[in-house]
Amino acid sequence: DVGRTASPHVWAIGDVASWRHPVGHQVRVEHWSNVADQARAMVPAMLGKDVPATVTVPYFWSDQYDVKIQCLGEPEATDTVHVVEDDGRKFLAFYERDGVVAGVVGGGMPGKVMKVRNKIAAGAPIADVLG
């Protein structure tokens, strides 16, 4: 099903494509970095090879003057938010859902945000990032 459409001769990746996330829901990520992740999964499928379920962690960033704002995962309004750093200009917040890390949002802390990607993909307990 990786990249498949209703037509057997058409495959889709990128902004226009909605893919089934391994936990069961459809997800459409509108960011160019997602295309590389999707291509790594889709090309073997196009060649007829078995493709294991892959977890793509949605990611985007925006440079606002001299502060890079980043988001990893799928934070939702109903998540528990743990603000672990905030000096009025730079900040780091983890989003918890059902005891696991659902996302991270940071401003001016690119290294700390990116370190959480594998934790989100693995469904790690929130304690792993709050420790």
List the model feature ranges, each with a label.
Residues 1-9:
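Glycine-rich loop(s) and the adjacent beta-strand/alpha-helix scaffold that form part
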Residues 7, 79, 114-116:
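Short acidic, gly/pro-rich beta-turn/loop elements at beta-sheet edges
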Residues 12-13:
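A structural signal for the hydrophobic beta-strands that form the central parallel beta-sheet
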Residues 16-111:
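Mid-to-C-terminal Rossmann-like scaffold of FAD/NAD(P)H-dependent oxidoreductases
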Residues 109-126:
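A short, polar/charged loop-to-alpha-helix boundary motif
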Residues 127-131:
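A short, charged
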